[in-house]
A protein has these predicted regions:
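Short runs within selected transmembrane alpha-helices of multi-pass transporters and secretion channels
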Residues: 13-26, 188-214, 218-238, 245-268, ...
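Helix-loop junctions and terminal segments of transmembrane helices
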Residues: 116-138
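Membrane-proximal transmembrane or re-entrant/amphipathic helices at the cytosolic face
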Residues: 299-358
Length: 358
């Protein structure tokens, strides 16, 4: 029952979110309709493309993007079918299977999708600049944009992954207080699979980057290969290691990792981009680990002192943000010029200089 309720909530949330987004887009379009019409009247000597040509370009552009997204989403359906059938063959009860799957989709996936969606939005913001540079045949600017966007995403993804792994149980207890019985299982999934945030964020970004340099089919092919490998890994983990729901968590992490690797190879092939490792991955990872240790110690002390989970977590989260920023700047993970590209970058630079971090 718990698992079924979580699945229903998960699906309902997705549908309502999509409907809300659609209504918002329609609302914005309706507001700007008069502006569009005025702009169209002012235009002179404009060649209007035929409806057939426009639809052809749209279909050629949209179908690879939709296919790539569909493969990402269909992996959940495939996972559910394989997991439930294999788990039944291994002797697990239907109730256990439903609860595990409900916790996986309704708690673990729900939470890791938050930072991944942020990465997806960031990826979309980088594509127009990248596409412009590519069509100007300015490959130096293309490589610079790929490097900047990758570093930007990793600076966000690593602390999110570590934070979710460290504070999985407190977060679940705060958000899902009515189903605390399954929060320990959810936090274990998060501890095992929080690193998927990094891989999914990077694979989502690299999909957008490849589409930005007119390699629309490449992410689709890579996603198809990854989903096949993912299924094989899932079956092996369940049959040989009997990891039950944790096999799904690990297989999904593998799927994203393989996507990252293949997309990275494709970016190198088509743009000549060579990935810098130290500042992009190592320093954010070390800074995030430092953040995780410090913030967990703070949380542990505060919780022992006040026994109020939400207060201990909020204060520890504030310390986490500060400690990560300090560690990242002290380790030279970001330069002043790179910080200017961040939201409120000028303010961050002023504060960092006052604290002698830059």
């Amino acid at each position: 029952l718990v698992g079924s309720e979580m699945c229903i909530r998960d699906r309902l949330g997705t549908v309502l979110g999509s409907v809300a987004a659609l209504l918002f887009v329609v609302f914005i379009f309706a507001i700007y309709m008069k502006v569009f019409k005025r702009q169209m009247k002012r235009e002179r000597n404009v060649r209007v493309s035929s409806f057939g040509y426009t639809m052809k370009i749209l279909v050629i552009t949209v179908i690879p993007v939709l296919l790539s997204t569909t493969i990402y989403n269909i992996s959940g359906i495939i996972d559910q079918g394989i997991f439930k059938q294999v788990a039944l063959l291994q002797g697990y009860t239907q109730n256990d299977i439903d609860v595990w799957w409900g916790v996986y989709t309704g708690k673990y996936k729900l939470l890791i999708n938050v930072p991944i969606s942020i990465a997806s939005a960031m990826a979309a913001s980088f594509v127009p600049v990248l596409t412009g540079a590519y069509h100007r045949d300015d490959m130096e600017a293309v490589r610079g944009q790929i490097n900047l966007s990758t570093r930007f995403i990793m600076v966000v993804a690593f602390p999110c992954a570590v934070g979710l792994a460290v504070f999985g149980l407190p977060i679940f207890n705060i958000l899902f207080s009515s189903t605390r019985a399954t929060n320990a299982e959810a936090s274990l999934m998060m501890y095992v699979g929080a690193v998927a945030v990094v891989f999914y964020s990077l694979s989502t970004l690299s999909n957008g980057l490849l589409q930005g340099i007119d390699r629309l089919k490449v992410p689709v092919i890579n996603a198809a290969i990854s989903i096949v490998a993912h299924v094989i890994v899932l079956i092996l983990l369940m049959l040989i290691f009997r990891l039950n729901i944790h096999a799904v968590v690990l297989a999904n992490t593998f799927f994203a990792l393989l996507m990252c690797f293949m997309n990275s190879m494709a970016l190198k092939k088509y743009s000549g981009f060579k990935q810098e490792i130290k500042k992009t991955f190592i320093i954010p990872a070390i800074s995030s680990l430092i953040m995780g240790v410090i913030s967990y110690i703070v949380y542990f002390i505060l919780y022992k002192a006040c026994h109020i989970e939400i207060i201990a977590f909020i204060l520890a989260a504030i310390i986490a943000v500060i400690s990560y920023a300090v560690a990242l700047l002290l380790l030279k993970g970001l330069t002043e010029d790179e910080l200017r590209h961040f939201p409120k970058g000028t303010l961050i630079i002023k504060v960092a200089k006052k604290c002698h971090l830059l």
